[in-house]
From Swiss-Prot:
Top class in the EC scheme: hydrolase
Domain of life: Bacteria
PROSITE patterns named among the record's database cross-references: CLP_PROTEASE_HIS (PS00382), CLP_PROTEASE_SER (PS00381)
Protein name, entry field: ATP-dependent Clp protease proteolytic subunit
Catalytic activity: Hydrolysis of proteins to small peptides in the presence of ATP and magnesium. alpha-casein is the usual test substrate. In the absence of ATP, only oligopeptides shorter than five residues are hydrolyzed (such as succinyl-Leu-Tyr-|-NHMec, and Leu-Tyr-Leu-|-Tyr-Trp, in which cleavage of the -Tyr-|-Leu- and -Tyr-|-Trp bonds also occurs)
Complex and partners: Fourteen ClpP subunits assemble into 2 heptameric rings which stack back to back to give a disk-like structure with a central cavity, resembling the structure of eukaryotic proteasomes.
Organism: Buchnera aphidicola subsp. Schizaphis graminum (strain Sg)
GO MF annotation: an example: ATP-dependent peptidase activity
Keywords for the protein's UniProt record, in alphabetical order: Cytoplasm, Hydrolase, Protease, Serine protease
Catalytic residues as annotated in Swiss-Prot or TrEMBL: 102, 127
Length: 197
C-alpha cells in the first residue's frame, strides 16, 4: 500500500543554549512566508487564515509572502483566504510557483497590487466555478442558482483585480483559459515575473 504522506524536511538552528529544530514550513513562517499547495479545502484554508492572522499580530507593517502552487479547490474555502487577505493590514505578496488554477488563480490576482508575481515557467488558469450535485430537481436548481451567484461575484472581483471588463472575464472564463507568465501580466493577473532575487 502506497503512502500519500510527504516527508517534511526539518531545519536545525544552533543557539547559545543548544539546538532548536523546526519543520521547514514553521521556519519559513518566521520569515513571513506561507505556502498554498495542493487542493484548497476547509482545513488548508483554516491553516492559511490562522497563519496570516498570526503574522499580522506579529507585525502590522511587514509584508506577508503567499507562495501558491495549487490546482484550485472549493470556492468557500478560497473565499475565506481572500477575505482574510483583504481584512489584514500587512500587504500580501502573492507568488505563483508551478501553477495557480481556478480559485488559486483568483487568490494570486488578489494580492496587493504591484506585489503579485510568478516564476517564468508558471502557468495560470482561470475558468467559471464548477459544481456537482445530485438529488431532487428542486435541490439541484437551488445549487445551480448558487453557482451562478458565485460566478457573478467572482467575475466582478476578478474584474477589479485585473482591470479587465466583466464582459471579457465572462467570456474568458466560459472554458478553461490557460495563461503563461507573460500573458498573465498583460491580463492583469500579476504585476511581474521573478527571475532572480
Amino acid at each position: 500500500m502506497k503512502s500519500n504522506s510527504v516527508l517534511i524536511p526539518m531545519v536545525v538552528e544552533q543557539h547559545s543554549r543548544g539546538e532548536r529544530s523546526y519543520d521547514i514550513y514553521s521556519r519559513l513562517l518566521k520569515e513571513r512566508i506561507i505556502f498554498i499547495t495542493g487542493t484548497i479545502e476547509d482545513n488548508m484554508a483554516s491553516s492559511i487564515v490562522a497563519q496570516m492572522l498570526f503574522l499580522e499580530a506579529e507585525s502590522l507593517d511587514k509584508d506577508i509572502f503567499l507562495y501558491i502552487n495549487s490546482p484550485g479547490g472549493i470556492i468557500t474555502s478560497g473565499m475565506s483566504i481572500y477575505d482574510t487577505m483583504q481584512f489584514i493590514k500587512p500587504d500580501v505578496n502573492t507568488i505563483c510557483i508551478g501553477q495557480a488554477c481556478s480559485m488559486a488563480a483568483f487568490l494570486l490576482s488578489s494580492g496587493t497590487k504591484g506585489k503579485r508575481s510568478c516564476l517564468p515557467n508558471a502557468r495560470i488558469m482561470i475558468h467559471q466555478p464548477l459544481g456537482g450535485y445530485q438529488g431532487q430537481a428542486s435541490d439541484i436548481a437551488i445549487h445551480a442558482e448558487e453557482i451562478n451567484k458565485m460566478k457573478k461575484k467572482l467575475n466582478k472581483l476578478m474584474s477589479l483585480n485585473t482591470g479587465q471588463s466583466i464582459k471579457k472575464i465572462n467570456k474568458d472564463t466560459e472554458r478553461d483559459c490557460f495563461l503563461s507568465a507573460h500573458e498573465s501580466i498583460k491580463y492583469g493577473l500579476i504585476d511581474l515575473i521573478l527571475t532572480q532575487r
